[in-house]
Design a protein with these regions (language model features):
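Juxtamembrane transmembrane-helix termini
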Residues: 49-54
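Non-catalytic scaffold segments within catalytic domains of secreted glycoside hydrolases
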Residues: 1-30, 36, 40-45, 56-319
Length: 321
C-alpha cells in the first residue's frame, strides 16, 4: 500500500489497466529478511532490488528519513547473509506529484530525478558497489510501438472481419494492453482527476506510450543521475537496464529488423557510453518480415502474458548487442 505512488493511485481507479490491486502483495517490505535468507539458502550471491521513489520523496522536496533507513536495513541484511546488494533507483513507479507536473514528458523530470538520486546516494552510497538508475529505460518508447501495432492490428481485423488471438502486441510487463485500448478514453478522464491534471494533459507515467522527446528525457535523467553518483562515488558501478526482444528476420525482413534494433537498442548507445554495465531483460523473440512483425508461430508455447516462451532469446540478444 504505497499510497504516494502513481501505480497505487491507478490501481484504485474504476477504469484501470491493472488486473487487480497489489495490496500487500507478498509483503516483502516487512518480510525482506526471510526472503533474503531463502535467496542465500538457494545459492544466490546477489540481490537486485528497488528503492521506491514515492516512499523516499512522497512530496516534492520533502524526503522521508525513516524510509531511507528501511533500505539501509535491507542492504545490511544482504551483507549479513552474503548477498551483494544492487539497488535500482526507478522501476516503473513514480511519485504522484511527478505525474501532476507532467510526468516523464516534462522537462523538469531530469532535475527531479537527479535530486532524488542525490538524496539516496548521499545516504546509502557508502554501502553499495552497484547501482542501476532506471529499469527497462526503453519501456515508454517500446510501449508506443506496441500500442501502434495493436491499433493497426485491430483496424486490419475489422477490415477483414476476422479475429486474431495474438500478434506482437504484448508488452513485457503486467499491463493488459487490450484492456488499455478499450478503456483508454474513460481511463484518461478519470486519471486527470486523480492526478489533478489540466484539461488535455494525459498521464505520462512510465507505463504510458512515450514520445521521442520523452525517450530523450529518460536518457537525460539517467545521465544526470550517473554523473551525480560518479561525482560522489567515482568507483561506483553504474548502469541501466533495457527490455530487448530477440528480433529474428524472416526472408526479406532484414531491413525491418535493423530498424527495430535501432529503435530498441542502438540509438541509446551515446547515452550509455560512459556506463559501467548494461542490464538486459529479454522475455521472448519477435519474428520480422518485410512489412513488420509477425504473429507468434502456430503451436508455440505461450506464457501467461501471451508471448512466445523462448528462453534462447536471452542468449541471442546478448550475442547481438
Amino acid at each position: 500500500n504505497n499510497t504516494h505512488s502513481d501505480s497505487w493511485a491507478m490501481e484504485q481507479m474504476k477504469y484501470t489497466t491493472y488486473r487487480e490491486p497489489s495490496l500487500d502483495a507478498v509483503d516483502h517490505y516487512h518480510r525482506y529478511e526471510q526472503d533474503i535468507v531463502m535467496m542465500a539458502d538457494a545459492g544466490f550471491n546477489a540481490y537486485r532490488f528497488s528503492v521506491e521513489w514515492a516512499r523516499i520523496e512522497p512530496e516534492e522536496g520533502k524526503f522521508d528519513d525513516s524510509e531511507i533507513e528501511h533500505y539501509r536495513d535491507v542492504i545490511a541484511c544482504c551483507r549479513k547473509y552474503g548477498l551483494e546488494p544492487m539497488v535500482t533507483l526507478h522501476h516503473f513507479s513514480s511519485p504522484k506529484w511527478i505525474i501532476t507536473k507532467g510526468g516523464w514528458e516534462a522537462d523538469s523530470i531530469v532535475e527531479d530525478f537527479k535530486n532524488y538520486v542525490i538524496y539516496v546516494i548521499e545516504h546509502l552510497g557508502k554501502d553499495l558497489h552497484y547501482i542501476n538508475t532506471i529499469n527497462e529505460a526503453n519501456m515508454r518508447l517500446q510501449f508506443a510501438r506496441i500500442m501502434e501495432q495493436y491499433s493497426k492490428s485491430a483496424m486490419q481485423r475489422r477490415k477483414d472481419c476476422k479475429s486474431s488471438t495474438n500478434a506482437s502486441e504484448n508488452l513485457q510487463i503486467g499491463v493488459d494492453v487490450k484492456k488499455m485500448m478499450e478503456l483508454q478514453k474513460k481511463m484518461f478522464e478519470e486519471a486527470r482527476e486523480v492526478f489533478n491534471l489540466p484539461e488535455g494533459m494525459q498521464v505520462n507515467n512510465f507505463h504510458s506510450p512515450g514520445s521521442r522527446h520523452g525517450d530523450d528525457l529518460i536518457m537525460q535523467a539517467h545521465m544526470a543521475a550517473r554523473d551525480a553518483i560518479k561525482e560522489r562515488f567515482p568507483d561506483m558501478q553504474v548502469g541501466l537496464t533495457l527490455s530487448l526482444h530477440d528480433f529474428q528476420a524472416l526472408p526479406g525482413g532484414e531491413e525491418q529488423m535493423e530498424k527495430l534494433w535501432d529503435e530498441e537498442f542502438r540509438h541509446y548507445l551515446p547515452a550509455i557510453a560512459k556506463d559501467d554495465f548494461i542490464g538486459v531483460q529479454n522475455y521472448t523473440r519477435e519474428l520480422v518480415g518485410p512489412q513488420g512483425s509477425f504473429p507468434v508461430p502456430v503451436g508455440a508455447d505461450i506464457t501467461q502474458s501471451g508471448y512466445e516462451f523462448y528462453p534462447e532469446g536471452l542468449e541471442l540478444s546478448l550475442i547481438h548487442i
